Design a protein with these regions (language model features):
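Membrane-integrated ABC transporters
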Residues: 1-44, 58-70, 84, 88, ...
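Hydrophobic alpha-helical segments in the permease module
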Residues: 70-81, 174-182, 247-261, 280-302
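Loop segments that connect adjacent transmembrane helices in multi-pass transporters
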Residues: 101, 110, 116-125, 194-242, ...
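ABC ATPase nucleotide-binding domain helical subdomain, centered on the C-loop/LSGGQ "ABC signature"
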Residues: 101, 336, 355, 415-417, ...
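Cytosolic ends of transmembrane helices, especially the final helix of ABC transmembrane type-1 domains
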Residues: 221, 245, 293-322
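ABC-family ATPase nucleotide-binding domain "signature/switch" substructure
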Residues: 400, 433-437, 441, 449-454, ...
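Helix-to-loop junction immediately C-terminal to a conserved catalytic motif
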Residues: 406
Length: 602
């Protein structure tokens, strides 16, 4: 949204977005508004009933009838108010739930690139805080604006019936109050948006600092990080104070203007009573209407403030809903044929065990338009069985290659094939169901040991889980835990090396066809590394294992080693072949102090 857009252009999409959240629950809103209208009608009728009682008293007539009606109306209004507020409360909770469900679903459908553009703390704030503001705007405030408007109109009509001249004087004052509020509203809306954006920025900064708390403390950077976060906190406070001040100005103008209008009406009405143009009971009823007019006008101003906050929240939620998502719609015929190809590929392994499971055909990829390509004209065939290792200096394109395989990134040119079928003809889920991935910074999924290992394979049996844990030398550790597989994992009961082993176990529990390892042995001891190498060797006999290596000792025995530099594959071969033919590979080996002779002998 450009800064030059008019307020109307900025607000209309937000109005539509607000309605999009209300629409599934519109019948609840309509029912609430009907109840609210009946409640407003009861309130509008009461001053007129009081006038009838006063007239009856002045004329010496019985007041039993009007008093009974007034009492019944008060009880009826109380019941209506209870049902109305209960219904609006349920509607508000439902709106929040549906908004959060929509945003969370979008997060998990979004591309990696669109998620990475924003701090995770800010994304969390949009789900937790912005949806609460949206709730107030789409349920309570939206209904109250209509009800307040109806109450104001109904009250003004009754005031006109009582005394048109006195009404015109009162209405003139209200018009001035409304005009002043309309002038102040846009600035207040801008302040509300800046306030919410600053809260999101603060949340993102704090989340990042807490995530790196060990590094912060080890670097003695507590004070510096505190000050950085306080800069954002002070900025948030500044915008919040600005928004509060603007809201206070609106309230003061509306409330003060209403009081002045009522005082003027009282003075002018007293003059008309003295002139014989208005009865005392009529003036009393008129003043009751005037006082009754103040709450809906003030409520209207407050609701408009809430809706302005809702617009700001809606705008931030709309940004989430516009995040680029991974395409999942694919032509059914193509998908069917692709799946057939997959089945053929699986069955053909016994016939052609070294046929490629994954292929890169002249692939070029970049992270942003106009940037330098991260991969250039890469041709690559990964056999359906065997261990393929990828090495190279930082920035060579190793992680980019994995991102392409996992469809976190799309090729700009060329084609990626899964058993002969182009990626472009396969759904994301179909591709990823064939792969298992262990990333370099291995996260533990919130939950238990069991839920972590069942994360990619919910059908895993307990025996399969224990087999996977045994393979990475974690069986004894988990059995020693108080709750075994049902132990909840936290940063305090799992070390970095154990996190990495859990990630490897999570990947191998379902015996994947293609296992992608991004330096899976970086934080484990030599004994466990040997165990994982055994797992890799075993998996490579029946499937494909692809390893990104920063420690060449983990890939010396690979069937094929790819050497990458500046986005290209500059050499490929076995360890011994590359030691003889490629200077860069020899430099990498020397830099890491790997004894080539010992490795070859092993």
């Amino acid at each position: 949204m450009g800064m030059s857009d008019s307020p109307a252009k900025q607000s209309w999409p937000n109005v539509r977005l607000l309605w999009s959240f209300v629409r599934p629950n519109r019948w609840s809103l309509y029912a609430g508004m009907v109840l609210g209208l009946l409640f407003a009608a009861a309130g509008i009728a009461m001053p007129m009933l009081i006038k009838l009682i006063l007239d009856a008293l002045a004329g010496g007539e019985s007041i039993a009838g009007p008093a009974a009606v007034l009492g019944g109306l008060l009880v009826f209004a109380g019941i209506l108010g209870f049902v109305y507020h209960n219904l609006m409360g349920v509607l508000a909770a439902q709106v929040v739930f549906e908004a959060r469900e929509s945003m969370v679903r979008r997060y998990f459908r979004a591309t990696i690139a669109s998620i990475a553009k924003r701090p995770s703390g800010e994304l969390v704030t949009r789900v937790t805080s912005d949806t609460v503001l949206l709730r107030e705007a789409t349920s309570t405030a939206l209904a109250q604006v209509v009800l307040s408007g109806v109450s104001i109109i109904g009250t003004l009509v009754m005031m006109t019936v009582l005394d048109p001249v006195l009404f015109l004087v009162t209405f003139g004052g209200l018009v001035l109050v409304g005009a002043a509020a309309a002038v102040l509203m846009p600035a207040m809306g801008r302040s509300q948006r800046l306030s919410q954006e600053s809260v999101g920025k603060l949340g993102g900064r704090l989340e990042g600092a807490l995530h790196a708390i060990r590094t912060v403390k080890a670097s003695r950077a507590e004070s510096r990080e505190h000050e950085r976060i306080m800069v954002d906190a002070r900025e948030s406070r500044r915008h919040s104070v600005s928004a509060a001040r603007r809201a206070a100005v609106v309230w003061a103008v509306v409330s003060g203007g209403m009081q002045l209008a009522i005082a003027g009406s009282l003075a002018f009405g007293a003059w008309r009573v003295g002139a014989g143009a208005l009865e005392v009971s009529g003036l009393v009823a008129f003043l009751l209407y005037a006082f009754q007019l103040a709450p809906p006008v003030a409520q209207l101003a407050a609701d408009l403030t809430t809706i302005q906050s809702g617009f700001a929240a809606a705008s931030r939620i709309r940004e989430v809903q516009e995040m680029e998502v991974e395409e999942t719609d694919t032509d059914d015929t193509v998908v069917s044929e692709s799946l057939d190809n997959v089945v053929v590929g699986l069955s053909s392994r016994t016939i052609a065990p070294v046929a490629p499971v994954l292929e890169f055909v002249n692939v070029t990829a970049r992270y942003a338009p106009g940037s330098e390509p991260a991969l250039r004209d890469v041709d690559l065939a990964i056999p359906s069985r065997g261990h393929t290792a990828i090495v190279g200096p930082s920035g060579a394109g190793k992680t980019t290659l994995f991102s392409l395989l996992l469809r976190f990134l799309h090729a700009e040119d060329g084609e990626i094939l899964l058993e002969g079928t182009p990626y472009s003809q396969l759904p994301f889920d179909q591709v990823r169901s064939r792969l298992a991935y262990v990333e370099q910074e291995t996260p533990v999924v919130p939950g238990t040991v069991r839920s972590n290992l069942q994360f990619t394979y919910p059908e895993a049996t307990e025996d399969e889980i224990w087999d996977a844990l045994r393979a990475v030398h974690l069986e004894d550790t988990v059995r020693a835990m108080e709750n075994g597989l049902d132990t909840v994992l936290t940063s305090t009961n799992v070390s970095g090396g154990q996190r990495q082993r859990i990630a490897v176990a999570r990947a191998i529990v379902r015996r994947p066809e293609v296992l992608l390892l991004d330096e899976a042995t970086a934080q484990i001891d030599g004994r466990t590394e040997a165990a994982i190498q055994e797992v890799i060797t075993e998996l490579a006999e029946t499937g494909a294992v692809v390893t990104i290596a920063h420690r060449l000792s983990t890939v010396i025995d690979a069937d094929t080693i790819l050497v990458m530099e500046k986005g290209r594959i500059r050499a490929r071969g076995t360890h011994s072949e590359l030691m003889q033919s490629d200077d860069l590979y020899r430099e990498l080996v020397t830099a890491l102090r790997i004894s080539t002779d010992v490795a070859l002998a092993g």
